[in-house]
């Protein structure tokens, strides 16, 4: 049964490493406010789409920085897996990071827009699948995940792992370079 009568999209805003997050140009200190996601939520609402977040946690990350849920979304936090599946199945589409919820949405046959610039285009899903949009910026550093173990070691205990630009102004530029407008333009065909 459809959980919301209006048209809506499910957003997957959390992941398992800061490298996978949609980081903001102002740095990780602002991430608990989910600035990029809030701007995208405004754009979706103006287009008649209600943004819904079905994450387990309101905040997720590593001290002293945590990533938050967009305040401008409908929050369905900590719901059961079956309820999460129901929300995703009946949504217009899913927008997320490289994360379990994105894989779940893809497995359910839902249209998926994945914000993922740390891995190469071919890595997660079939680029020929019309239900899949890969949101990337090839004009900046990207794809380090697919070179880990070859060109440099992956350090799993380092939440802020960025093998090329860590602790420089370019730290996480793979995702800070992706704007809410770029994401919105990438999914316009589904609205």
Regions from the language model: what does each represent?
Residues 12-22, 53-64, 145-162:
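Short regulatory "switch" loops immediately downstream of catalytic or recognition motifs
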Residues 106-191:
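Nucleotide-sugar donor-binding patch of glycosyltransferase catalytic domains
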Residues 26-123:
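Donor-binding and catalytic core of enzymes assembling or modifying cell-surface/extracellular glycoconjugates
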Residues 11, 86, 185, 189:
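Charged/polar, solvent-exposed surface patches and flexible loops
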Residues 7, 72, 168-171:
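Short amphipathic alpha-helical segments
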Residues 1-31:
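Mid-sequence helix-capping/hinge segment at a functional interface
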């Amino acid at each position: 049964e459809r959980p919301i009568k209006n048209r809506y999209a499910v957003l997957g805003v959390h992941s398992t490493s800061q490298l996978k997050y949609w980081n903001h140009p102002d740095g990780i200190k602002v991430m608990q406010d989910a600035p990029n996601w809030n701007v995208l939520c405004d754009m979706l609402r103006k287009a008649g789409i209600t943004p819904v977040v079905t994450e387990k946690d309101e905040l997720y990350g590593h001290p002293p920085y945590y990533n938050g849920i967009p305040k401008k979304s409908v929050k369905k936090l900590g719901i059961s897996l079956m309820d999460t599946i129901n929300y995703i199945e009946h949504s217009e589409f899913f927008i997320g990071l490289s994360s379990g919820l994105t894989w779940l949405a893809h497995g359910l046959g839902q249209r998926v827009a994945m914000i993922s610039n740390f891995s190469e285009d071919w890595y997660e899903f079939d680029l020929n699948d019309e239900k899949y949009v890969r949101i990337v910026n090839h004009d900046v550093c990207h794809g380090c995940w697919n070179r880990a173990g070859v060109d440099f070691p992956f350090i799993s205990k380092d939440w802020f792992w960025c093998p090329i630009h860590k602790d420089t102004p370019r730290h996480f530029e793979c995702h800070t370079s992706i704007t809410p407008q770029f994401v919105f333009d990438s999914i316009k065909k589904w609205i």
